[in-house]
Amino acid sequence: MNANHYQTKRDRSYFEWGDKMQIIRKGKGEIAMTESEFVDFFSVTWRKLNYRLQLLLKTYPLQSEERAAGEVEVFVNGHLRGYALLYPLTIIIALSYQLDGMEAHLFRKHICQELQHPTPMVEQIFIYGSGSIN
């Protein structure tokens, strides 16, 4: 996706916290989050988030698709006020290593568990026959 692509929450997935501090993936598209979703998800201040995010984007040589996953429209009182950048999963993971809170630690743990235990593939087996089962 390019930076001029506009998305809604229906077009993407994002992370939220469940009741017992479990991570819930919401949505059905590619994972991408806005800065305000980072602040809520990682429970950090805007100042800390902006500092760490700018440091990450300036310091590390990232490809353009690793930097942004599009934009989402921002509405205030029903009026379009602007656009917020969406950051892809690569930035979310890298940012979690720049933050030191419990939420970032649990997110890193979740990502490592997902990588170690991939979702099992379901194999379909078709049996061709020319008669009844009896």
Question: Where are the language model's segments positioned?
Answer:
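Short Lys/Arg-enriched helix C-cap and helix-to-coil transition segments
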Residues: 61-77
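Residues in the recognition helix of alpha-helical DNA-binding motifs
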Residues: 52, 56
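N-terminal entry module detector
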Residues: 31, 44-45, 57-62, 66
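Positively charged, aromatic-accented nucleic-acid-binding surfaces
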Residues: 1-48, 74-134
